[in-house]
Amino acid sequence: MTTPVRTRFAPSPTGFIHLGNIRSALYPWAFARKSKGVFVLRIEDTDVERSTEQSVDAILEGMQWLGLDYDEGPFYQMQRMDRYREVLKHMQEQGLVYPCYMSTEELDALRERQRASGEKPRYDGTWRPEPGKVLPTPPAGVQPVLRFRNPLTGVVAWDDAVKGRVEISNEELDDLVIARPDGTPTYNFCVVVDDLDMKITHVIRGDDHVNNTPRQINILRALGGEPPVYAHLPTVLNEQGEKMSKRHGAMSVMGYRDAGYLPEAVLNYLARLGWSHGDAEIFSREQLIEWFDLEHLGKSPAQYDHNKLNWLNNHYIKEADNARLADLSKPFFAALGIDEPTLAKGADLVSVIALMKDRASTVKEVVDNAAMFYREPNPDADALAQHVTDAVRPALADLAAALKACEWTKEGIAAALKATLGAHKLKMPQLAMPVRVLVAGTTHTPSIDSVLMLFGRDVVVSRIEKAVV
């Protein structure tokens, strides 16, 4: 019987969560769903000084927005301290750890001497018990750290799903501190206990954790466990080629929602930011689950491309249900001072969204372009002077009369425009541009008949008549 796949996302709630961070949730989530396995959420909050409830909320909110549902958790490391102490006690009883009284100052001085002589700076095992070795006398009043007895010989090796075979000599590794002087366990120890207890089979995480992996494998084996499959993801770079970070201008995950991106577009883009399925650029959440595998994870850093994300978001906006987009648009209208009562009194919002969405990269852009339907026109003086000329006023007057009488449909409005053009021997731009300026306050709109139909007969006629009276 095969072991069920169990993956995890284990963020530290110490601030900002950007696309590079949340990708480390997407891939294990997709792999668990593909494998009909279990996806676990674990909050690694042992850094008490930097961990905040606000950061936890940002992680949960970002995952929920993208639809990354978890099966177990969230588990909080700070709530598992009794379990860590229990394992530490077992390790002490088994001789797997030992107390070390070397002070920070002594350790710094040791490393300086090692650097000066061309050695790799590392703890030298001063307090490590060995047969026949006489240990220094513990200093009075000093609480020791606990160090793990790392094997002195041999090799730690694993077949990384991204990096291939990785081998590290144990001689390269010193004895890791796994408990601080106050007894609190350290990160690398907690991770191992959690992965063992939660029966994690696949660890899919950023390659900044590669250096931790041999140490974690040795602790895992000392506790009688077998290492999971590791897949260390290359870094996500920003558009300037730097590692994505808040310091280098990365946007938070929820910042994309607030800028008008759809979650399905961000999910699709994020999936392609380090994984591929042939030449497929656009795929649904269901297709991602069907296709996802570890074999096609990229081996090189992935670079964020904002234009590509905009292209994808435009695709999903065009495909999206108009009523859903109308609901999503309301906060963006509110930011422009257009409240819901104003929207209700103006042109039908769902119809406006349907007309305006195709050219927009974000919901915010849809709203910016659609705001004209809910505001009084405020055309630029140059546009008025250029397009609303004395020569065209007679045609505008006739058009207003024709629009009063025509059937108020796209076809009826188009017929009124065509008749006016014919009577005054004008070309469409000569009439359509002044009408756009007078009715919408701008020269940039979709087809004039569609726009006028949504504004409504009374608004259109009154705005044209004001200019020709």
Swiss-Prot record:
A motif ('KMSKS' region) lies at residues 243-247. Catalyzes the attachment of glutamate to tRNA(Glu) in a two-step reaction: glutamate is first activated by ATP to form Glu-AMP and then transferred to the acceptor end of tRNA(Glu). Its EC number is 6.1.1.17. Residues 116-131 have a biased composition (Basic and acidic residues). This is Glutamate--tRNA ligase. PANTHER family: GLUTAMATE--TRNA LIGASE, GLUTAMATE--TRNA LIGASE, MITOCHONDRIAL-RELATED. GO terms for molecular function: ATP binding; glutamate-tRNA ligase activity; tRNA binding; zinc ion binding. One of its GO terms (cellular component) is cytosol. GO terms for biological process: glutamyl-tRNA aminoacylation. ATP binds at residue 246. It catalyses: tRNA(Glu) + L-glutamate + ATP = L-glutamyl-tRNA(Glu) + AMP + diphosphate. PROSITE patterns: AA_TRNA_LIGASE_I. Belongs to the class-I aminoacyl-tRNA synthetase family. Glutamate--tRNA ligase type 1 subfamily. Residues 116-139 are annotated as: Disordered. A motif ('HIGH' region) lies at residues 11-21. It is an enzyme of class 6 (ligase). It comes from the Bacteria.
